[in-house]
Amino acid sequence: MSNSSMSVVILAAGKGTRMYSDLPKVLHPLAGKPMVQHVIDAAMKLGAQHVHLVYGHGGELLKKTLADPSLNWVLQAEQLGTGHAMQQAAPHFADDEDILMLYGDVPLISVDTLQRLLAAKPEGGIGLLTVKLDNPSGYGRIVRENGDVVGIVEHKDASDAQREINEINTGILVANGRDLKRWLSLLDNNNAQGEFYITDIIALAHADGKKIATVHPTRLSEVEGVNNRLQLSALERVFQTEQAEKLLLAGVMLLDPSRFDLRGELTHGRDITIDTNVIIEGHVILGDRVRIGTGCVLKNCVIGDDSEISPYTVLEDARLDANCTVGPFARLRPGAELAEGAHVGNFVEIKKARLGKGSKAGHLSYLGDAEIGAGVNIGAGTITCNYDGANKFKTIIGDDVFVGSDTQLVAPVTVANGATIGAGTTVTRDVAENELVISRVKQVHIQGWKRPVKKK
């Protein structure tokens, strides 16, 4: 039984040489966020009183990227093994709390498995997460006597008989702070690697008569670490497959689960259909009967009931009411809002603008910093000229306005209800209700005109 108080140590000091990258290994993204963030999130969900993050290589970048004031940063200046890393964190351990040891490059460890490990830890003993492998080569072996764990021996230090053992150490364990500090102080580096192994505390605990309980993870992928990009990509696919399966079982129709990426959180209604190669980032909310076409990217957006997003459309920080249609090849940038029944067609970009109920922008337009009323038609090629090189200005368009093709609205400008803007017009002054505005150069016809001929 674990103590009521629990803190977590996350080892994240490694350079990750085999990643061949300037980025610290634990900052490489999995499902849209750094590997180590997955581990931090798990620790927080467990209710850890403190999270101690042991860092070394790329420490400043780690601090800048994670920017979490609740983390306690512990420097491991030299990487001399897992035991040495824990020794750096040991001064922060309270005697009466449990200490759970995790790894920043083992990102898929589940809260459920960790809760079982904490619950299984004997009073005053150690809880150890282990797995059995068909090919345990390279891993530390769990040594038992009469069924009881008595030690862990690393592969390089193991005898031939010990190498036949198929139960291996995952590195994840929990022990109480008082005993753990004492055992850490007794570690030495008299081994093939010349490092301080955290695994040596198992033999020390056994010598003290402490019980050591083992727990297996629900899935092997939970304890798989990342040392190179191949392993990272494999875990990415494992994670995405799991997310896709959960969505399918919850009623979301993924037309090809192997070509769907969830890099955040998806909240959804009923009868959702998502085509291939769709990417979900941040927190996305989909209402009932929403249809998402192939190749779309949705980030931090809300899409109302019965709306359809056609292929290759990008939505970021946008909000759509019910029965909206967007795309194909449209882009809604932060602050874009579509009222019920609004339509945005191909190659239309909307930024920090609201399109009113039933309004349409069908083709090739830019609408930025604008408030557009209900029942408005935005003709092809319309641009709200919102920026003078220094400041942004707003365009306001009332209800039932017809804006002809190739119109430029030079903000700040207001077009009142019912107005009509002729094609090719540049609007520089406010337009009153029900006015027709046209600004064009007089059309000239020259008979018999001959185009210039290139000199040979």
From Swiss-Prot:
Gene3D superfamilies for the chain: Hexapeptide repeat proteins, Spore Coat Polysaccharide Biosynthesis Protein SpsA, Chain A
Cofactor details (free text): Binds 1 Mg(2+) ion per subunit.
Residue ranges, annotated region (Pyrophosphorylase): 1-229
Residues where acetyl-CoA binds: 380, 386-387, 405, 423, 440
Pathway involvement of the protein, from the record: Nucleotide-sugar biosynthesis; UDP-N-acetyl-alpha-D-glucosamine biosynthesis; N-acetyl-alpha-D-glucosamine 1-phosphate from alpha-D-glucosamine 6-phosphate (route II): step 2/2; Nucleotide-sugar biosynthesis; UDP-N-acetyl-alpha-D-glucosamine biosynthesis; UDP-N-acetyl-alpha-D-glucosamine from N-acetyl-alpha-D-glucosamine 1-phosphate: step 1/1; Bacterial outer membrane biogenesis; LPS lipid A biosynthesis
Spans annotated as N-acetyltransferase: 251-456
Catalytic activity, EC: 2.7.7.23, 2.3.1.157
Annotated Mg(2+) binding sites: 105, 227
Reported cofactor(s): Mg(2+)
Reactions the enzyme catalyzes: alpha-D-glucosamine 1-phosphate + acetyl-CoA = N-acetyl-alpha-D-glucosamine 1-phosphate + CoA + H(+); N-acetyl-alpha-D-glucosamine 1-phosphate + UTP + H(+) = UDP-N-acetyl-alpha-D-glucosamine + diphosphate
Active site per database record: 363
Claim: Cell wall biogenesis/degradation is one of the keywords in the record: yes
Positions bound to UDP-N-acetyl-alpha-D-glucosamine: 11-14, 25, 76, 81-82, 103-105, 140, 154, 169, 227, 333, 351, 366, 377
Chain intervals for the UniProt region annotation (Linker): 230-250
Alphabetized UniProt keyword annotations: Acyltransferase, Cell shape, Cell wall biogenesis/degradation, Cytoplasm, Magnesium, Metal-binding, Multifunctional enzyme, Nucleotidyltransferase, Peptidoglycan synthesis, Repeat, Transferase
GO annotation (BP), single: cell wall organization
PANTHER family in the cross-refs: BIFUNCTIONAL PROTEIN GLMU, NUCLEOTIDYL TRANSFERASE
Self-association state and partner proteins as the record states: Homotrimer.
Similarity field: In the N-terminal section; belongs to the N-acetylglucosamine-1-phosphate uridyltransferase family.
Chain's role: Catalyzes the last two sequential reactions in the de novo biosynthetic pathway for UDP-N-acetylglucosamine (UDP-GlcNAc). The C-terminal domain catalyzes the transfer of acetyl group from acetyl coenzyme A to glucosamine-1-phosphate (GlcN-1-P) to produce N-acetylglucosamine-1-phosphate (GlcNAc-1-P), which is converted into UDP-GlcNAc by the transfer of uridine 5-monophosphate (from uridine 5-triphosphate), a reaction catalyzed by the N-terminal domain.
Name of the protein this chain belongs to: Bifunctional protein GlmU
Name of the gene this protein is made from: glmU
